[in-house]
Amino acid sequence: MIRIALASQTDIAGWREAARKLLLAGVIPARVEFNIGTETLFDEGDPIPPPGDRTPVISKELLGDIQTALLHSDPERFALAYRIVFRAQTQPKIHQNPADPDMHILRALAKSVRRDIHKMHAFVRFRKVGERGD
């Protein structure tokens, strides 16, 4: 098992870097576990194998959905995203399949995040401390 330690709940850059290395090495999703926070002595997993001759390719649309979904609080979001990008290497149009179960979950996570962002913009108002509100 390869264990990837991400710095925080929203460490998208760390996930992207790890996912790129894993894809280059051809590591299957079942061998990867993503964790939040620092590793301990007992969390040490297998090292990432050396890269092969592949070049990972992901559509901009899929990458946008993944980046939004990674902001969700679902504990399996990082594993789901890696599973999808791994599959996208052999199924480049996976993001266009509305019946794909992984894409259905990813889109639901992204939709939830977008809805929360909208609610924050629409309903949360800030004012300076010390000013009297209406």
Question: In which residue ranges do the predicted regions lie?
Answer:
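Extended, well-ordered protein cores
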Residues: M1-D134
